[in-house]
């Protein structure tokens, strides 16, 4: 064997040994019905149509859920509807100073004393368009949709880092974030999309995966839809509204091990709204 060949052999051996510690075992994907088994999820503002659907889908996948909402009465009713795998806590997203205490309380609601998954589900529209937007409307939308989301994510991710929990954070954005933003709602949801990218880059070194889902029109009370109404609509290419359960099923996958390599992405479930049609 020549000197050159021997040197190459030694170099190859050195790097093979050096990289042994970085070997990642291949894990076979789990049965979807158990994707979130033994996980505890905090669903922020989980008393609305999408929040309840996400909670139901999470429980079907094996998770326990903690529902938060501004109205204690709504939280109580939602938890009663969801059953034994659910707990509730009142959190006002306009009162950031309470977040640390509220998150600590939420952690203690189940014997596991932990939070593995955070879903930021809050969203308010505001009914004023550019040119007539009041400061009060602007602040109300931004405080709920963006400011509250930012600080809740900061607090829960700090907890995950401290406890070395390789968790998942899922932000609920909107297909409206892809449109030219001239309302507080569109601007706030565009901010959520941007923050999702930044938080993902900041937290992935700790094994915390951050992504977002962006619904288009969904058949919920926010859009004046109720059970029994038609899903048909002319306003998007798919010609129908999404159902809350479709959002919930996608959310399950997004916070499961199946999406550990999806980092900082926003999944659009919009029927083409915002992606191929503005």
Regions found by a protein language model. Name each.
Residues 174:
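Residue(s) in the substrate-gating loop at a strand-loop-helix junction
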Residues 153, 188, 196:
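Active-site helix of classical SDR
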Residues 26-28, 263-278:
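Short C-terminal tail/terminal secondary-structure segment
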Residues 158, 201-205, 260:
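Alpha-helical segment proximal to the catalytic Tyr-Lys
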Residues 47-48, 71:
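Conserved glycine-rich cofactor-binding loop
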Residues 129-130, 134-142, 232:
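Substrate-binding pocket helix/loop in short-chain dehydrogenase/reductase
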Residues 1-38:
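Non-catalytic terminal and boundary segments that flank Rossmann-like NAD(P)-dependent oxidoreductase
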